[in-house]
């Protein structure tokens, strides 16, 4: 069974609740590396946990700024890249989170080296 959110199909392996979807047009892309694309949203300023969204090979995940998988899922190798990026770029992620909470434009964050 497929569900649709924002007019886009969601794969069977993804939980709909707790995972914010709608990647693409109008969604701030803050980084990309090794086929992984990282997004952050402005409309999540009421969420208590600083997090971002990762997309890779048709799979999506919400990941905390500390690199903990919150919802969804990625292949283990891609998740490892995301977690390494989060540990290296934690300060930049938190700065963007604060900018999002203030409804300010988000800044690009450098990819993995």
Show the residue positions of the predicted features.
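Short acidic-hydrophobic surface loop/beta-edge motif
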Residues: 29-33, 54
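Charge-dense, helix-prone N-terminal extensions
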Residues: 24, 33-39
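A short, structured beta-strand/loop element
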Residues: 41-78
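C-terminal structural segments of small proteins and small subunits
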Residues: 81-113
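Extreme N-terminal basic, low-complexity initiation segments
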Residues: 1-8
